[in-house]
Amino acid sequence: MKDAILWNKLPGGKVECIACSRRCKIPDGSKGFCFVRQNAGGRLVLANYATLEAIQIDPIEKKPFNHYMPGSYVLGVGTSSCNWGCLFCQNHNISKERDIKGKEVMPEELVALAKKYKTGSIAYTYNEPTIFIEYALDVAELAHKHGLKNLFVTNGYMTKEAVHEMKGLIDAAVVDWKGNGEQKFSNKYEVVVSNEPIKEALVELKRSGIHVEMTDLIVPGVGDSLEACNSLTRWAYDALGPDVPLQFTSFHPDYKMMDYPDTPYETLKAHYDIAKKNGLNYVYIGNAPGNPYESTYCPGCGSLVIGRYGHYLTEWKLDREKRCVECGTLIPIVGGPPKKLSYRDIELVY
């Protein structure tokens, strides 16, 4: 347990948490929607500080980042619970956990693990990192001192105040839309009343100098509106620019939506086509290994510049300045090239 940041005192012993956009108003002795941010005698505390339910080494493309340190490996960590209520959550074993469980790993221990396993970064992932932001930022500060980068894998439902705290400590964030951000879908399947805070957070993240990428989980039949895709990608072009990476990912049955099918490839390709038509240069299709759109192509000449199969790199056709070797177009990639293009077994640390 640790004193939280990002909260206000309210009358009657209540506190308002301002880490995520739910802005829960919490009576003394109670917890917010996330079940880990708690009012303890009129002060907000993080009840699961440094208590991790998942610690694992992954390819960075699994997060998924396609334009940040491609080909590298990341130490991913997550805790209990979440600030959303997704009915399809693939990590529901930890995100729906209401008891605080896991292994205590203090910031210095986590950084030591990252160095031991020779990862270039630490990702706060598996559940929503905004709810354990105090721990993430404590780790991030120490990680920077050891030359490690810090990554948020987030639903983006964070406040501007939270982004302000992240500035200078979090290096990159991938924001995971679901169902094209269509509001009826979010209301019913995510327990989210408005997606506007996500858009505000994305703009604020970019303004703060944090590298931003996006994913969009396409759920067949209920979260695959092409009209909503058109709206979201037009907004992304206008607000974030043509070079923001966007990956459409395939749904698979999980948690309370086991009776829904996998997303047809044709549906993903239709979304891809709309995003490209709306001017986005770097659009991907994920969770469909072997498809041509998991690779990066030069917007100048169309040549393949980074080849991928699943989460692994197969080709690198950029020069030292990250320019396409065919036409010289500068490709917005942070980091790389990898030392070698090879498969490394995913290691379960805890």
Specify the residue positions occupied by each region the protein language model found.
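Ferredoxin-type iron-sulfur electron-transfer modules and their immediate structural context
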Residues: 1-61
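Conserved Radical SAM active-site core
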Residues: 39-172, 341-350
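Short, conserved glycine- and acidic-residue-centered signature motifs
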Residues: 70, 103, 194, 264, ...
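Auxiliary Fe-S-binding modules of radical SAM enzymes
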Residues: 1-28, 222-350
